[in-house]
Amino acid sequence: TTMAPQLFHRQLEDGAWAITVANIHQLRLCRHWGINRVLMANQVVGYQNISDLCLELRDNPEFDFYLLADSCQNVDQLAEAAKTYGLSKPIQILVELGFPDGRTGCRNTDLALEVARRIKSNEPYLILKGVEGYEALLRTRPEPEDSIRIFLKDLNLLAEKIALEGLFGQGEIILTAGGSDFFDLVLEHLEAPSGRHEVVKVIRSGCYLTHDSLAFNRFFEKMKHRNDKVSQASPGLLPALQVWGAVQSIPESGLAIVNVGKRDVSYDVELPIPEMYFRPDKDQFPQKMPEGCKVTLLHDQHANMAVPTFPEFQVGDMIGFGISHPCTTFDKWRLMY
């Protein structure tokens, strides 16, 4: 989640169905920035969080908001709060299907059906508006693509069973999945349930917006190999996020210390990679980083950068780093250019 209002509005202007958030304070910021449709791809739990949500929905009944549920306890909590706050419209809920050893989400379709029935039993305070899953965590399984296809089949089966029992509310229903690794498989295998429901399919590949130079770039290359339509898209997804710093010390041969550290750039997946350099009193434009230069260690405020093939580096040279995992770089900055 970028938490950048200009980027949110650019996405919506370009046709994004909604903005996705993970918690209540992100929701508050979206509302402050005038976002009128939000999907919280998470459960809302805790007295204060549920109360804040109900106040927002009570005071702004036109706000189109969706959240996830994977337990009957949470459903009952939401229903009680909706009743207490006298909401004029029901809280819109998607049942979340998960998988064993995953994250949140009902561990099988039978459990998910119980949650769907509980939502139905709490009308008119709640309304079941669809089903949701997050398949990207299956990337670590021995056969990830097969595991994802099986999971999407279960997601389709859940939607079908809910439709057959008449548990969905009136109006269109939402089917949503699709992390940035496998959204092509979601588009291929996510199917609308039979019946008269109008269906909106929503993929949530949030990292498409900035992409990166490492992890998600590799995921996209794999996607191009397995999907001809993706490979034919030119130029495809390109990295759009760099973090720049300056060489502040060259304490020994082959080593440059750059003033970029863990407080400035993501490191939870991989260390950043130096991509460009610029000497302010010499270069007119940034130059491509010589091969062999790499970050070997990241401290709070500094990066150790091995420069075995380019001894000409000087203190004051600017270095542009490509990143791995945009989300945990965005959260380190209040302003980006």
Features from the language model and the residues they span:
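Active-site loop/helix belt of alpha/beta enzymes
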Residues: 98-230
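Internal helical hairpin/lid segments
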Residues: 207-287
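Generic secondary-structure signature for well-ordered alpha-helical cores
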Residues: 58, 80-83, 87, 117-125, ...
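Conserved, mostly hydrophobic/aromatic
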Residues: 30, 95, 131, 175, ...
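C-terminal accessory subdomain/extension
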Residues: 250-337
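Generic beta-strand/beta-sheet core signal
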Residues: 41, 178, 206, 259-261, ...
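Active-site-proximal beta-alpha core segment in soluble small-molecule metabolic enzymes
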Residues: 2-141
